[in-house]
Amino acid sequence: MRNKIYVTKEMPHEQQEQCCNIDVGKVIANDYKNNPTVFEKETKFDAFYYFRQIINSIIEHSKTRIVFTNLGILLEKDFSLDVPKFLLEYAKDYQVFILKGPFNIVDGNKLVWNIDKPENKIEFSQGVIESLNQE
């Protein structure tokens, strides 16, 4: 189903062939090493457009699923990125999965890294996130 974000502990081995796995933190950090001036505050930096460009360049278009990991970098305040919108752009064309990492699902619509720091969260509209692992 499109326009949903699935959260799972791991992708079943039999589904790996359909998946394009993207370590977001690693991909963006590698691009930063190669193009540090793009990220400078003095430049007109559009994180939404630029990060999509980076990720689109590595997506294998024969795949039907994208598995995102290591999303913390997207929460950097300097980027001012609308993370739900960013991820949902991919959910238009692919099944999007987020591997459950160091975060919790709170209230059914928030991925929260630290309960005590509410700014460390990604908040979706209700009904967008679906947990595939019952806890």
Task: Name the predicted role of every residue range.
Residues 1-60, 108-116, 122, 129-135:
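Extended, compositionally biased accessory segments flanking or bridging domains
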Residues 58-79:
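Conserved P-loop NTPase "ATPase switch" module shared by AAA+ and STAND
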Residues 6-11, 25, 69-76, 99-102:
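Structural motif
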Residues 2-5, 65-67, 95-97:
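Residue-level preference for the first positions of well-ordered beta-strands
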Residues 9-17, 22, 66-69, 84, ...:
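Aromatic-enriched hydrophobic runs in primary sequence
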Residues 47-54, 67-70, 83:
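Amphipathic alpha-helical interface surfaces
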